[in-house]
Amino acid sequence: MKKSNFVFFSGGSPNHLYDSIHDSDFSTELHDVEKRGIIAGCSAGAMIMGEKMIKGVGLNYLPNTIVIPHYGESFYSWISSTVKLLNRGKYKLLCLEKDTYFIKDGDQLSVLGKQNVHIIYKKEHHTFTDGDTID
């Protein structure tokens, strides 16, 4: 891993991913990978990028943020509704629709994909599409 420039986390259980990674040599090395390359994830792999998850904490690559994948998909709609109620404005919600991604470069996020990324914070709801940047 010392020469890796790309790490991808797939879906599954976000809590299992976090428990397997945090406070490990792998976690320490991830920060070095971030400096020289890309850390990516989908579904649960995206959820662990935030500071907080629906249950538990994340890896904090996005401070003050909860990442919600599958946003708008009917099966997962209860998750985003529940998080909005529980959140009460403490964290930003970064909600990803299907086939849509964000790229973090420093403090800026760029949107890439077929659908939208939503940032929900308190009573504000902003929608971003392919090519948009988020400060």
Question: What positions do the PLM features span?
Answer:
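C-terminal and late-domain segments of enzyme folds
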Residues: F6, M53, V57-D135
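Short, basic, helix/turn surface patches
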Residues: G12-H16, K122-H125
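A short, aliphatic-rich alpha-helical micro-motif
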Residues: M1-K2, E34
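Class I SAM-dependent methyltransferase SAM-binding "motif I" and its flanking Rossmann-like core
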Residues: F9-S10, H16-W78
